[in-house]
Amino acid sequence: RLLRRGTCAFSILFKLFSEGLYSAKLFLTATLHEPIMQLLVEDEDHLETDPAKVTERLTPAQQERFGEKGSEDYKQRVQAAVEANEAKLVALVNKFIGYLKQNTYCFPHSLRWIVSQMYKTLSCVEGLEVGEVRTMCTDLLLTCFICPAIVNPEQY
């Protein structure tokens, strides 16, 4: 849980180390530049998945297309919009995953070594299954390395 929140000493050190690593910035730039730019260019859609909030950002003219609030037609159109947004989010996440896979060759060796040492150490701990150890390593990479670059790409 502490790794996931990024509040334990190890995850803080990992994040600070990866932020200062030039090869990490190269990897993040190579991996995330194109999908983030595409997302920014195609930023017309508000990818909201909460039915109560789907129409909040729409203009009154756009809201009228959903019908009268509370009607069955309105609910169906909102649900259709939610499903369309979910499909767009799935496609977007798959695009990011594709770029991550495509650029694994330039993943920084020092970060690879740290994660492998973490994996080896945690694999020896009684009571931890291999799946849990893999999840912890993945959480560390996502929480402290990849997601911050997606949320704040200018820094990288």
Predicted segments with their positions:
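Extended alpha-helical scaffold/tether regions of large eukaryotic proteins
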Residues: 1-156
